[in-house]
Design a protein with these regions (language model features):
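Short, well-ordered, mixed-charge alpha-helical segments that flank or form enzyme active sites
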Residues: 112-116, 167-173, 342-343
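Signal peptide-proximal N-terminal region
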Residues: 33-44
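Short active-site-proximal "capping" loops at secondary-structure junctions
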Residues: 41, 50-57
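Claisen-condensing/thiolase-fold acyl-transfer catalytic domains that form or cleave C-C bonds
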Residues: 20-21, 28-29, 35, 54-105, ...
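Glycine-rich, mobile lid/loop segments that gate access to catalytic sites or pores
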Residues: 135-196
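Flexible, glycine/charged-enriched surface loops at secondary-structure junctions
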Residues: 42-43, 154-158, 173-179, 226-227, ...
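Generic N-terminal amphipathic, Lys/Arg-enriched alpha-helix
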Residues: 3-19
């Protein structure tokens, strides 16, 4: 495989509600910051790919407006995925492996505060049997959490401990929405919003945007910083019908992990950090088990999605945060992104600092 590296990243502050700027205005400064971080200009970029959701923006082909943030010139080959921008990164990675391009700029954005995100995401469900019932994402995640509790592996205290660690880690992340020291005992006093989930178990509504620069390593400039080379990447999807899945286990994640291990040659115990896209606290535990992670690997040093969750960019942020961790001393990072209800579709990547 061609050696593809992540070299630049920028993220807007993850705030609860952006009342002044629209999506383009949020995105524009982050593009400049990411290019500066990489030591590049738009003239150095061969391909642009984005991830967003028309249902969140409330308009068809809303991503076209975001192209304005790239500038009128120079013209660029552009593409879009109607899902998390982590899959936009995957599209760019494939193009680089195929020799079509050398460099790419990836971005994702979302203003979840303008709509009802838990209801909007029900459009990902089976259109014949589930979507017409309008089950929201929190209720579905609670269903999954109940299955996990009934398995006897974890309980609500374990869920709260995930949040405690997330908030503690997020204190080092200036862009995090939720950060600070909390205790599991205090968290467990909060009322349920959908048993066994409480508000803190759910990712916060967040407005923002993120931008990432990657390319074939030989074509990238030396910006004086460590780069994050993608040693392996794979994604797997499970069946659409929830009743046919083992909700307490993420089979697709385990399958993707096996492929990434074969590609990268990196054993699970060699990862210093893991950035996991788990929008609900029980899902962190499900992913940890599926990946075989131990306490040797620091999970979500950025705080993860429970500290800030830009819809359609949270998966891309896991890649960006892995770059930041590598630039701060980590050697290897495991990156995870998800799409669909209850961890239906999972993408994994092995990233190594050079």
């Amino acid at each position: 495989m061609r050696e593809v590296a992540i070299i630049g990243y920028a993220q807007s502050p993850q705030i609860r509600q952006e009342t002044v700027c629209n999506e383009v205005e949020i995105l524009m400064p982050e593009i400049d910051k990411a290019l500066t971080d990489a030591g590049m200009t738009m003239s150095d970029i061969d391909f642009v790919c984005s991830g967003s959701c028309d249902y969140i923006a409330g308009g068809a082909f809303s991503f076209v407006g975001a192209v304005d943030s790239l500038g009128a010139t120079p013209c660029k080959m552009e593409s879009h995925v109607e899902m998390d921008a982590a899959w936009a990164l995957y599209e760019a990675w494939i193009k680089i492996q195929a020799g079509e391009i050398k460099t790419a700029l990836i971005y994702g954005f979302g203003k979840s505060s303008v709509g009802q995100l838990p209801d909007v995401m029900s459009q990902q469900l089976d259109p014949y049997y589930l979507a017409p019932l309008w089950p929201d994402t929190i209720s579905l995640a609670a269903l999954q959490a109940n299955v996990l509790v009934q398995s006897g592996r974890y309980n609500e205290t374990d869920f709260a401990n995930v949040v405690v660690e997330s908030r503690r880690n997020a204190k080092a992340n200036n862009n995090a929405q939720l950060a600070g020291d909390v205790s599991a005992a205090d968290l467990l006093k909060a009322p349920y919003i959908s048993s066994p989930l409480r508000k803190h178990d759910c990712c916060p509504i967040t407005d923002g945007a993120s931008v990432l620069i990657l390319g074939e390593k030989s074509a990238l400039p030396d910006n004086g910083k460590r780069a994050a080379v993608i040693r392996g990447m794979d994604h797997r999807m499970e069946v659409h019908q929830l009743g046919l899945r083992e909700l307490a286990n993420s089979i697709s994640t385990a399958q993707a992990m096996a492929q990434v291990k074969d590609q990268s040659g990196i054993a699970v115990e060699q990862y210093d950090i893991a950035e996991l896209y788990a929008p609900f606290s029980p899902q962190t535990l499900i992913l940890k088990d599926a990946l075989g992670l131990t306490d040797k690997t620091h999970i979500n040093p950025s705080g993860g999605p429970l500290a800030g969750h830009i819809m359609m960019s949270a998966g891309l942020d896991r890649f960006g945060m892995s770059l930041r961790a590598i630039q701060n001393g980590a050697d290897r990072a495991l990156v995870h992104a998800t799409s669909g209800p209850c961890l239906q579709h999972n993408l994994l990547a092995a990233v190594e600092g050079v």
